[in-house]
Amino acid sequence: MNNTEFYDRLGVSKDASQDEIKKAYRRMSKKYHPDINKETGAEEKYKEVQEAYETLSDTQKRAAYDQYGAAGANGGFGGFDGGGFGGFDGGGFGGFEDIFSSFFGGGGMRNPNAPRQGDDLQYRVNLSFEEAIFGAEKEVSYNRESSCHTCSGSGAKPGTSPVTCQKCHGSGVINVDTQTPLGTMRRQVTCDVCQGSGQEIKEKCPTCHGTGHEKKTHKVSVKIPAGVETGQQIRLTGQGEAGFNGGPYGDLFVIINVLPSQQFERNGSTIYYTLNISFVQAALGDTIDIPTVHGAVEMSIPAGTQTGKTFRLRGKGAPKLRGGGQGDQHVTVNIVTPTKLNDAQKEALHAFAEASGDKMVHPKKKGFFDKVKDALDVD
């Protein structure tokens, strides 16, 4: 067995945190539980998951496993050089004592009957551009592990109760003796009868089959504050999955996703808008109604405005989540060049070019009246 097999059984990496290992164990344990999964080989997989978790959940045993593999985790010392204890500091036996104590249960065991909080959940909610700016209230619906309504989470058939496990006497662990080159060593492992709960269910609940949990659709109202952005999270305490041994529910993390706007763009509390104007408006100036999320605002365009010029509408942006106040809206001018001109428009532009002293590459085409003058030879 290599030094990553236990991690592979739980589907986590070798540098996984204890919290990640615990969540993976719960997930895999439910997946292969014999009372839920009737497929061939599920029970064996379940035992392998228990074995992996029993080692990786204990800091000292995990350290021994990472360094020496299964032999270290199970009490063997293969890998030591015959001439001494290579790898340990010659000034003391601190590292050896840590590993040695894990074989004898020196590190202690957690109370298997202690209440444990349920798993956290995530839910992604879509908001319109305006909802993200002004805030909203959304009702979200999702499936979660809830306390079984039939047995109230005990896992036992109504009218019955779990009893103290006869094998481990309620401790959740049993002692196992292992023969090693150093003699018989005793270590503690999770009880294979009660799976570490310390209690044995003789008559299982017909609804949850002894797990104490059942899948239910849950609805909750979420208040979205004004000014949120994509990727931000809102934590709803107690809206996650049911706990264990009477422990509290986990939390729900609502992840915000803001849908794009057809008119505006946004960065933090600043909103951006592109204003298309004509050459005439840019040259002569104009007063234009500018759309904002707060309603139309009248803005003056000075004569001679160039493409790319940006104006600021103060207080017309999004709320600032931190520090309070309101952001601004930036209006950037884009001068639109017409693609289709009628004869009158062309005449006017040619006249403008002549008045400006611009030299045209292509000479002005004669109009109808010019042609009449030429025909009559009129000056």
Swiss-Prot record:
Keyword presence, Repeat: yes
Cofactor remark: Binds 2 Zn(2+) ions per monomer.
Protein name, per record: Chaperone protein DnaJ
Gene Ontology, cellular component aspect: cytoplasm
Family annotation (SUPFAM superfamilies): Chaperone J-domain (SSF46565), DnaJ/Hsp40 cysteine-rich domain (SSF57938), HSP40/DnaJ peptide-binding domain (SSF49493)
Zinc finger (CR-type): 135-217
GO molecular function: ATP binding; heat shock protein binding; unfolded protein binding; zinc ion binding
Pfam family, one: DnaJ_C
HAMAP family with a match to the protein in the record: DnaJ (MF_01152)
Gene Ontology biological-process annotations: chaperone cofactor-dependent protein refolding; DNA replication; protein refolding; response to heat
